[in-house]
C-alpha cells in the first residue's frame, strides 16, 4: 500500500449542497466548524484540490486547503476559530499575532502563522482556547503545501519565496 497524506480543509461562506457533495466525494470528514480533514495519496497537493473545490463554491466563499504536518518541526501554524455573533475575538487575535508573522489572507476566522514557536499544537490550542470567547478553536501544524481560494482567484504558497509579499502564485 502506498503512502498517504493528511489535508485540512477550511471553508468560510454559505455551506451549499455543492460543497457538501464535494466533501463527500473526497471522503473528507468534518472536524471543526466548516472544516474537514481527509487522507489522500502521497502524490496529492493542495493547489489541485483548491482548483477542483472552487467549482463547487459560491463566488463570495473562501477556502483554504493545507497539508497537515504532525511534528513540531512544522512550517506554519493554522489557527481557526468559529464565528459566534457578538463575540469579541480581539484578545485571541492579539495572542495569535504574538506567535509570529501572520500571512495576510482574506479570512475572518482562519490564520496561517509563520512561527518559530515549537510548542506542540495541543498545548498551544489549550492556551489560545483560554482566550477564545466561545471556546471553539482549532490549532494544527501545516507544511509549505497549502493554497487558498477567495472567490474566483486561487493562490498557492510558494515555499522558495524570501519574503511574505512574494509568497504566492495565482492559478
Summary of predicted features, one role per range:
Residues 24-72, 99-148:
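Short, intrinsically disordered low-complexity segments
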Residues 2, 18-21, 149:
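A hydrophobic alpha-helical transmembrane-helix feature that marks the membrane cores
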Residues 18, 48-49, 91, 123, ...:
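Exposed alpha-helical structural elements
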Amino acid at each position: 500500500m502506498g503512502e498517504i497524506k493528511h489535508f485540512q480543509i477550511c471553508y468560510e461562506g454559505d455551506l451549499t449542497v455543492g460543497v457538501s457533495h464535494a466533501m463527500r466525494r473526497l471522503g473528507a470528514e468534518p472536524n471543526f466548524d466548516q472544516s474537514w480533514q481527509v487522507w489522500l495519496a502521497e502524490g496529492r497537493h493542495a493547489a489541485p484540490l483548491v482548483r477542483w473545490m472552487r467549482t463547487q463554491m459560491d463566488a463570495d466563499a473562501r477556502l483554504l486547503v493545507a497539508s497537515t504536518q504532525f511534528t513540531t518541526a512544522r512550517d506554519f501554524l493554522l489557527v481557526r476559530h468559529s464565528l459566534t455573533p457578538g463575540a469579541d475575538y480581539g484578545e485571541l487575535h492579539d495572542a495569535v499575532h504574538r506567535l509570529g508573522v501572520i500571512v495576510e489572507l482574506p479570512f475572518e476566522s482562519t490564520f496561517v502563522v509563520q512561527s518559530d514557536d515549537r510548542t506542540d499544537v495541543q498545548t498551544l490550542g489549550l492556551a489560545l482556547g483560554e482566550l477564545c470567547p466561545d471556546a471553539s478553536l482549532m490549532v494544527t501544524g501545516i507544511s509549505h503545501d497549502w493554497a487558498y481560494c477567495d472567490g474566483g482567484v486561487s493562490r498557492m504558497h510558494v515555499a522558495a519565496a524570501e519574503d511574505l509579499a512574494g509568497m504566492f502564485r495565482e492559478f
